[in-house]
A protein has these predicted regions:
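Sec/Tat signal peptide C-region and signal peptidase I cleavage site
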Residues: 2-7
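Auxiliary tRNA-acceptor-end handling modules of aminoacyl-tRNA synthetases
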Residues: 8-65, 69-311, 329, 333, ...
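The catalytic-center signature of Zn2+-dependent metalloproteases
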Residues: 18, 343-366, 428-485
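Solvent-exposed, polar/charged alpha-helical surfaces in well-ordered, non-transmembrane soluble domains
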Residues: 39, 317-324, 328, 432, ...
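Short conserved micro-motifs at the rims of enzyme active sites and ligand-binding pockets
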Residues: 79, 126, 317, 402-403, ...
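Solvent-exposed, acidic/flexible segments
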Residues: 312-319, 323, 423-431, 468, ...
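Extended catalytic-interface subdomain
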Residues: 374, 379, 385-393, 434-442, ...
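Conserved catalytic/binding loops enriched for acidic/polar residues
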Residues: 451-817
Length: 817
């Protein structure tokens, strides 16, 4: 289920408006306290009414809209979805779901109540005592009431729903998503109401008043102009879909923490003496074979994606290819053409088709500067059945994928050594993005472990990568194969990997003979247990302390992968100007390309952070053969990580000092950029949580641990390597870094644990080195810098002495100098 916007408070949007046409003197229900009078049908639904039959009969009489609810639909649950269909230019995009809620209508005398329904608390036995207890204790919120205006044939009831839409009920409102304070009913109009057999679709033009705060949808970095401040009006197109939940609920499938899946959870009460359990089921599409006995069968109903009408024609073949890539995984479990991607039908083919109809899964192309895409879904809260999963592709994701491909792998692909990339290559990158987002709409979350399961050798192998790509799941953020080197011939773009086939089998594979979710458990456990022998089938969420669960990384050795990636960055810088600067034009593209390349360099270096003090999670269940689920990163790898930083980052990277490039678009700032890249990593290396893990590792395995003392010594030695020279010279970039080292370690003196005492010892040791080196420095800048460092260290060690107080002499601590 999509997250709902925050509830409306007193005096907020819609305050004072009658809810559902009931409350308030003189409202549709008549004077306060007066019972509503049920009129003859013809007086309410006049001969001039425009009516449409479907889930409910809908009627328009002048400017009022009525629903005629059949008696057999009272008490039935329906899904109500609100979508931002159109938006002003400054909001970037529409076609975004903002609310969804399960509701039901029930009759109470001459009124109809609209209740919000949840399925978060249930009983194991629907006919048992616990179910009766829950029913006695449970009450569902009444979010609106309606007077019954008239009744029709077969006890149908007619209610006025006009104010549901123009009155901005909080439960269905878009105001929180657009940063508005309230809706203005006088500037809000219902455009159309259509009723279909399973759903009702309502479109309206709604005007809100700005000032609600928050972050409006689509307003992200670089996403178009700001809102017109000369008016407080925000006019949008809204779309409400009311959809009948399946008459035959799909059999749910139980989740397993070892297999990543979007899921729906509820609390379940069992017998009187049993504890309350949390039951988690997969969010997945209903997929059933036409011929259950056939090894390969088409589904009764394929998962169908429609290509939105706004998708540029030249990109549609690539989008379709990206969608249908998943068919290979479904064929492995016996489904032929499980996924279908097609154009939306023409009016001649299907005059009733509406791509905004929530019954249809439509890939939308959003005219936005947001460099992203996402794959949302809406599910039946009773069973997890996915009812809609419409991927959203922002137009500027093309720019993002172009820049990433150029920065990461252009040395391995001559086509990419000139910007912009050729159309066919851009199409291949778009297909990859679509495949990833469609995976989300099938129920799969990000698997951040997948990019770390291939070895460096495998990533450089043409044969391996042609078969599996560069990560074991396309649902990771592994991106393009920056580990591959020129001449390797390896595949550069991700594809479906072993984990994707495995996860689809777990979620969609048929289990013959199973009648209940519990019946499926033995077979599902057998599938999940295959992870024991095959690490490529393992799942993991992103973790800052686990080097195998990072974002945007590749390979089972972060240090070596980064070393190889930096070689490719160096190669890109060799042809950056030629690739990005076009004769006769300004340097905007060059500046963007440079920033992308530098950003990629920083990202690859950050992957190594998790190695230091890192813990690797196995996420296996009891009996799978592992003794523990968490294992420290070996000390040798941690030491190698710090060595990489000393060599490739703390020694001033020559690649970042390129005035021949940067002065084409920026007069200064090189020194600041170098320091920013260094200080972020330095701060991360000595963060308290990392130091506490390292101290604990040392306590548990003192002979084999990489200790906090080791880390501090390695950093001090690397960052102050000039101090051992006979005539030390410290350049501008290193002076900046060394000052940052002192202030960073000074900041640790107020921390807790071993980090505090060892930071103090490190500064005392450093003070002695700096004092000795200051007398040997030849150039004025270095001498001034070293004397300034002495003062800064004294300030950190004992501010009283530095300020002229009566404290102990600086450095008078029980540590060697």
């Amino acid at each position: 289920m999509l997250a709902a916007a925050s509830a409306q408070g007193p005096g907020g949007p819609g305050a004072g408006l009658p809810r559902g046409g009931m409350q308030g003197p003189g409202g549709p229900g008549g004077p306060a306290g007066a019972p509503a009078k049920i009129k003859p049908y013809a007086e309410v639904i006049t001969k001039d009414a425009k009516s449409d039959d479907g889930l409910f009969m809908t009627h328009q009489v002048d400017e009022k809209y009525y629903w005629e609810i059949p008696a057999d639909k009272l008490g039935a649950e329906v899904l109500w979805v609100t979508t931002l269909d159109k938006s002003p230019t400054f909001y970037g995009f529409g076609q975004t779901e903002v609310q969804d809620r399960v509701v039901r209508f029930e009759r109470r005398g001459d009124k109809i109540l609209l209740r919000s329904v949840t399925h978060t608390i249930r009983a194991e036995d629907p006919a048992g005592d616990m179910t009766r207890s829950l029913l006695m204790a449970k009450v569902e919120p009444i979010i609106a009431t309606f007077d019954i205006k008239t009744t029709g044939n077969k006890d149908s009831v007619v209610i006025d729903v006009t104010n549901v839409y123009t009155g901005d009920m909080a439960e269905f409102s878009a105001k929180g998503s657009i940063g508005a304070s309230r809706m203005d009913a006088s500037r809000t109009f219902i455009d159309s109401v259509k009723s279909y057999p399973k759903n009702i679709e309502v479109k309206l033009t709604a005007t809100f008043v700005a000032g609600g705060g928050g972050s409006p949808l689509g307003r992200r970095g670089g996403d178009g102009p700001s809102r017109d401040s000369s008016t407080d009006a925000i006019t949008v197109g809204l779309h409400h879909s009311i959809v009948s939940l399946p008459d035959r609920p799909m059999m749910a499938r139980l989740a397993d923490s070892r297999v990543g899946w979007f899921s729906t959870s509820h609390f379940e009460f069992g017998t009187a003496d049993a504890p309350v359990k949390t039951i988690t089921v997969l969010d997945r599409w209903r997929l059933e074979k036409k011929d259950p006995r056939a090894a390969l069968s088409e589904p009764v109903t394929p998962i169908t994606y429609y290509l939105g009408s706004e998708i540029p024609a030249k990109w549609k073949p690539y989008v379709k290819r990206g969608v249908e890539e998943w068919n290979a995984a479904f064929e492995k479990i016996g489904y032929k053409n499980a996924i279908v991607c097609r154009d939306i039908p023409t009016k001649a083919e299907d005059p009733e088709f509406d791509q905004d109809d929530v019954r249809y899964t439509v890939i939308r192309w959003l005219p936005s500067g947001v460099e992203n895409a996402y794959g949302p879904h809406i599910s039946d809260p009773r069973t997890g059945e996915i009812l809609n999963g419409s991927p959203k592709i922002f137009h500027s994701v093309l720019k993002l994928s172009n820049n990433w491909y150029f920065a990461q792998v252009s040395p391995n692909d001559p086509r990419a050594q000139k910007l912009p990339l050729p159309e066919s290559l851009q199409g291949d990158l778009l297909a990859y993005v679509v495949t990833h987002e469609v995976g989300h709409t099938l129920g799969l979350p990000h698997n951040m472990r997948a990019s770390s399961t291939f070895s460096i050798k495998q990533l450089r192998s043409k044969e391996w990568t042609e078969k599996w790509g560069d990560e074991s799941s396309i649902m990771d953020y592994g991106r393009f194969n920056y580990v591959s080197q020129p001449g390797d011939g390896a595949r550069l773009i991700p594809k479906l990997g072993p984990y994707d086939y495995f996860a689809i089998e777990y979620g969609y594979g048929a289990i013959p003979g199973a009648k209940t979710p519990a019946d499926e458990v033995p077979a599902l456990k057998a599938i999940a247990n295959r992870q024991t022998q095959n690490p490529m089938l393992r799942f993991g969420n992103q973790s800052p302390e686990d080097p195998t669960r990072q974002s945007e990384d590749l390979g089972d050795d972060s240090v070596e992968a980064t070393r190889l990636g930096l070689k490719n960055i160096d190669r890109v810088m060799g042809y950056l100007v030629k690739a990005a600067a076009k004769p006769g034009e300004d340097y905007e593209i060059l500046a963007e390309a440079y920033n992308t390349v530098m950003g990629q360099r920083g990202m690859e270096l950050r992957h190594v952070l998790a190695v230091v003090g890192g813990m690797i999670e196995n996420n296996q269940h009891a009996g799978q053969g592992t003794q523990v689920n968490y294992t420290p990163v070996p000390a040798g790898k941690q030491r190698a990580a710090v060595r990489l930083y000393n060599e490739q980052l703390f020694q001033t990277p020559a690649i970042m000092v390129r005035p021949d490039i940067t002065r084409k678009f920026n007069p200064s700032g090189i020194a600041d950029a170098v320091l920013a890249s260094q200080s972020g990593i330095l701060s991360g290396l000595v963060q308290d949580s990392r130091l506490k893990r390292m101290s604990e590792q040392e306590a548990l395995t003192p002979k084999s641990a990489y200790t906090v003392a080791n880390l501090f010594d390695d950093l001090r030695t690397g960052i102050f390597s000039e101090l051992v020279s006979a005539k030390p010279v410290v350049d501008l970039y290193r002076r900046n870094l060394q000052r940052t080292f002192v202030s960073t370690f000074g900041g640790k003196l107020t921390a807790s644990g071993d980090g505090k005492s060892l930071a103090r010892q490190t500064l005392v040791t450093l003070r002695g080195q700096v004092k000795n080196a200051a007398g040997r420095a030849v150039d004025r800048a270095t001498r001034a810098h070293l004397h300034d460092l002495l003062k800064a260290i004294d300030d950190q060690l004992d501010p009283k002495v530095s300020a002229g107080g009566s404290g102990a002499p600086a450095g008078a601590f029980p540590f060697p100098r």
